[in-house]
Structures are given as structure tokens and as C-alpha cells.
């Protein structure tokens, strides 16, 4: 069966849709966090939404979607997408791509219950060298380091970038010291 399809005002099929996201298990349920996209004629509006499943096959959209209706002030709501969710300590964290003043950002949110989210900090941002938008960000730990990986828009086509550094969960800030490309696109 189809797990997720556009059906609501916040992920309207005719003018937007369900964009990518991620999943996490919590209390015996599988939770999907995804981007709902709609367009009422004046550009895309993107928000972060939640669906859940008891069996991992049949999903129900959360009745109070969107769980994050807008990015923080000054960020582009038509470029606010692709949430990655994980748990650390007592909080769930979510990173999604956005942009402000034509520079890419990875925005960090946190929640105690996956339903009520607060903006925590800008996890990392471009200073101009990594394009104007970061799509499909991923954030994970390897050993004692953290990695932020994304697909930048506005630089070399078909490139994926990774940043390696240290995460401070008290401040919500990621400080990277190493940068690299995952691949160089198609041959």
C-alpha cells in the first residue's frame, strides 16, 4: 500500500505535494516527518508535517499538521524542506534546509514529543561557498565527531557536500572543521 500521498491543504496534490523527510521509531510507533508543499498562485509554501504508523505499513497524518508551519522570520518559506529527525538525550531534533538572504542554512528544531517543535538554532550556514539552499540535509554522529551532509543548490551540479565537526547540544550549534564532496556527479 501507499504509505503517504498528498491529501490535505498543507500538501495539496494539484499544486504541491509530499516532499522528502525521514522516519524514527518511538514508543512502538513509526513516525514520518516530511515536507508538505502547496502553492496558492504566489509561490510554494513549505511546512514540516508528521504521520505515524502502528504497523510500519499503514500511516495516518497527524491531525494538527503542520508541526512546523513556517521557518523563523527572515527565512524563505518556499525553500524550507527535507527534515531529518533523530533523538539525543531527552529531545528529538530535526534539521531541515532553508535559506536567508540567498545563503543556505540548516535550521535546527527540538521537541520532547515529536508533535510540538521549537526553533533551537541555525545548525550551520553557508558563507557563500556552499550555494543558496541545502536540500536533503542529514546529520549524524561518527565516533566523537558529527557530520552534516547535504545537496547544495547553486554550485556545481550534482554535488553532495559533507561537513565534519563538533556539535554542542546545549547551544544547538555545529562547528565544522573539515569539508568534502561525497561525489562529483555523473560520469
Role assignments for model-derived ranges:
Residues 1-82, 86-130, 134, 141-186:
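Beta-rich carbohydrate-recognition and catalytic domains
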Amino acid at each position: 500500500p501507499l504509505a503517504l500521498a498528498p491529501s490535505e491543504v498543507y500538501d495539496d496534490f494539484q499544486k504541491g505535494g509530499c516532499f522528502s523527510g525521514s522516519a524514527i521509531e518511538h514508543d512502538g510507533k513509526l513516525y514520518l516527518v516530511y515536507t508538505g508543499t502547496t502553492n496558492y498562485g504566489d509561490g510554494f509554501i513549505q511546512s514540516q508535517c508528521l504521520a505515524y504508523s502502528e504497523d510500519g505499513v499503514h500511516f495516518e497524518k497527524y491531525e494538527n499538521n503542520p508541526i512546523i508551519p513556517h521557518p523563523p522570520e527572515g527565512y524563505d518559506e518556499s525553500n524550507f524542506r527535507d527534515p531529518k529527525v533523530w533523538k539525543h538525550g531527552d529531545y528529538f531534533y530535526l534539521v531541515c534546509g532553508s535559506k536567508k538572504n540567498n545563503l543556505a542554512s540548516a535550521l535546527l528544531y527540538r521537541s520532547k514529543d515529536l508533535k510540538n517543535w521549537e526553533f533551537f538554532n541555525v545548525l550551520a550556514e553557508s558563507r557563500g561557498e556552499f550555494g543558496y539552499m541545502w536540500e536533503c540535509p542529514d546529520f549524524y554522529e561518527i565516533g566523537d565527531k558529527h557530520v552534516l551532509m547535504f545537496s547544495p543548490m547553486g554550485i556545481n551540479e550534482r554535488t553532495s557536500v559533507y561537513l565534519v565537526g563538533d556539535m554542542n547540544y546545549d547551544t544547538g550549534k555545529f562547528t565544522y572543521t573539515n569539508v568534502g564532496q561525497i561525489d562529483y556527479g555523473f560520469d
